[in-house]
Structure formats: structure tokens, C-alpha cells
A protein has these predicted regions:
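Phosphate/nucleotide-binding beta-alpha loop and adjacent structural elements of enzyme active sites
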Residues: 1-160
Length: 160
């Protein structure tokens, strides 16, 4: 409920980056409720199917862009590790399986594949994505690496 309440405060027609979009609950809510342009970052092949379905069921394909790769600290090609193969599943990460505080394994993974990832700044600079006004990050333990990549002052100044 806290995240939905937060989305209710968004200014109309804002840019919302949903990093770790899963099946698109917050993406769809922001696109329909606040008329946001949404960039839904979701690298799990299992979650992508439901994300696409939810966007189409809600007639939001013009408002939500799907980015099927992970955000990370810097441009890299690495292993995307998943703890399960369930649709709507969680507990996955990119490039590492260690938590940032005590360097313990985050979880046991049983499925992985290699893909590329890039930083928030690189997404704006290299791919011309619009600067976000709002960012939600829910990526099971590598939030610190994604935030570490947020160097550009003009990008930070755009956030609400």
C-alpha cells in the first residue's frame, strides 16, 4: 500500500522508471492513475510474459515501455541468476549473488542465463531514455549497485 500511496502523489504526465517491474503492478497503476510514461525494467524471462499480458489487458502499451534487461553499476555482460522458474517470481539478481553488507550469498539460484546490463546514466546517455521524475527499485539485493551508477547531476536534479 505504501508504494501505491506514493504513486498517487506523482504529478500527471511524469516519467516513472519501475526497476524490477516484475509483472507490472506498479507500472500499470502509475500509467493508468497518474498518466505517467513508464519504463518497466524487468529482465526475468518468466515475468516478462505476465508483464506484457498485464500491459495489454489494461490497454497501456502506449504508456509503458518494457526494457528486458537489468540495470546495474556499469555496462557489462553477466549472469542473470534466478532462484526459481515461476511466473511472477522474485529473488533474482545480476552479476553477483552476494549481499552488499556482509558478502553472504543472497540465495541459491537454480536457473541463469547471460545478458547485458547497463547503468541508469548509460540508459539516458546511450539509449536516449528520458530522465525519470520518479524511480522505484526492487531488485533483490543489488539496489546499492544501481544507485552507485547514478552520477549525473542533471539526472538527479530531475527526480522528485
Amino acid at each position: 500500500p505504501e508504494t501505491l500511496n506514493w504513486i498517487d502523489t506523482f504529478k500527471k504526465n511524469s516519467i516513472f522508471w519501475d526497476i524490477g517491474a516484475n509483472i507490472g503492478l506498479y507500472s500499470c497503476y502509475a500509467a493508468s492513475r497518474a498518466n505517467c510514461q513508464v519504463y518497466a525494467f524487468e529482465p526475468s524471462v518468466f515475468n516478462l510474459e505476465l508483464l506484457v499480458k498485464n500491459i495489454n489487458i489494461n490497454s497501456l502499451s502506449e504508456k509503458i515501455k518494457i526494457i528486458p534487461f537489468p540495470l546495474c553499476e556499469k555496462l557489462s555482460f553477466n549472469s542473470f541468476n534466478l532462484s526459481n522458474k515461476e511466473w511472477g517470481g522474485a529473488m533474482s539478481n545480476f552479476g553477483t549473488n552476494k549481499d552488499h553488507e556482509n558478502l553472504q550469498d543472497l540465495f541459491k539460484y537454480n536457473f541463469n542465463y547471460n545478458t547485458f546490463g547497463l547503468s541508469i546514466d548509460e540508459s539516458v546517455k546511450l539509449l536516449n531514455f528520458p530522465k525519470p521524475n520518479y524511480i522505484k527499485i526492487d531488485v533483490d539485493g543489488i539496489e546499492h549497485l544501481i544507485l552507485k551508477s547514478l552520477h549525473t547531476k542533471f539526472l538527479i536534479a530531475n527526480l522528485s
